[in-house]
Amino acid sequence: MANEIKEIQVHSIPEFMQQILAFEYEGDCTVYFRGESKDHKGTAFQPSIYRKLKHLEKEHLIYREMQRFNNHEFTEDRSAFDKLSRMQHYLAPTRLIDFSEDALTALYFALATRKTCDDAIVYVTAVANEKIKYYDSDAVSVISNLAKLPLDNDDIREKSKRAIADDANKAMLKSNRIDEYKNCKSTDFLLHEIKEEKSYFSHIIDPQHIFSAQFVKPKLTNTRIYGQKGAFLLFGLNFDDVKSHIPIIQYENNAPVLLDNILIQHPIKKILKLKISCKIDLTHLKKLGVTTPYIYTGMDKVSEHLKKISE
């Protein structure tokens, strides 16, 4: 099933806020925002780990190398998701994409890295509350720990994302999919990784979670996440192609649509796409108190900002 995504161009901050206040949706939802510096169209909701095949092939190495060289940064992180969320804010390729609870924060991100006078984009999304997960959710642990496994493994095939996807794919076709997946060898390797953070985790994984994108509220221990009022969409594996991300948006007849069906599991119920014209820039946000220190509360970014405005 696909739902049309409405596109509206805005030329001022009041117009931007007016469109958000007029955004309507059905059901019990929370509104989250995502800012992008340009219109990426069908790849707008694509995690960075999928933008280059080499990144995906080395995801398990990136995950470990980031910690090997920066172990002191991860001392408070207890789970794979905690570590991925910290890596995301240091621009490492991950299977996360950022959202914010704050519309002006999303607008800042859309404008701060805009390099041309093309429209920047802010996506306004209605996320079903019943499907929002917390950082310690079992489904979140299942997907996050995929990052520790190689895409392919010539030595032990079952210890790979491809084997996990193949086995989960077959199990999904069965009426007793959870029991079916429980008996797969690849499940043992994934469970081994999960039990590093949850020793009590039972030998039960719903294969549907493997092929889902979960909306997650993180712990606010990271100052960047706290300052940006952040949340994440965490991507599992694509049911049809393990090398591609789970599609959320696609274009039909040059118009964007929101995908949602049994094989594309995600919690986003509605999207409004606001195209930010060049008449809006960071000086307008500055008048509202939204500057670099408002977004990046760390001492490095604050000092960098103060140095810049003092020159």
Which sequence ranges carry the predicted segments?
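Catalytic-core elements of nucleic-acid end-processing and repair enzymes
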Residues: 1-311
